[in-house]
Amino acid sequence: IGKDTLEVLEKNKVDCACMKGLRCCGMPAWEQGDLETLRVNAQHNLEILIPFVEKGSKVLVINPTCSMMMRREYTELLDGEDRERAKKLSEAVNDPSEYLWNIRNEDRFNTDVNSMPNEKISYHAPCHLRAQGIGFKGRDLIKKITGSNVKTVMECCGHDGTYAMKVEGFDASKRIGQKSFDGMKSEESEVWATDCPLAALQFKQHAGVKPKHPMSILAEAYR
């Protein structure tokens, strides 16, 4: 997904760089009540990213859980100077589809595709992306660039961070996600899409189809 994202950004003349040394956003630690690890990771990430933010760079975050942490939770979970830096980071964080949607009226926005995905695509809207209030930009980009008919499924897949990875949460997560599994299947689409890699694992395990990330669908269309 990372390589596909870089390919799509390059096709749209976005000057980008991958930063070395970044740590986990801290969500798994937070879910276990380990606030110390969360704060250490957050402070480390701020040290790396803030110099670029202060120069005007955006921070594109592929995983919706990670972007939610950096955009919404760091500002609540950190104190003092770290909180002020977290506010700067929050304003700079974008989902890749969100960033590309925001430049759709610029000359560099690229709709010149060499292949088309299937006419009908089932798109799952991840909970952690919806929580950021940015709309469904992955879906909208696929529609705008490829012209595909994209059907949206809103129900939670049940993964919920690390919840579905635990023995005690596995069966419950499947029950919670059943409506989303049924919704994706009901469209009878050959291609499924979601912005969340964890949701993709949940669909693969319980519905038999692994959705593609919107960036992967677009990268294939550009090739």
Please identify what each model-predicted range represents:
Residues 1-223:
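Iron-sulfur cluster-binding electron-transfer modules in prokaryotic oxidoreductases
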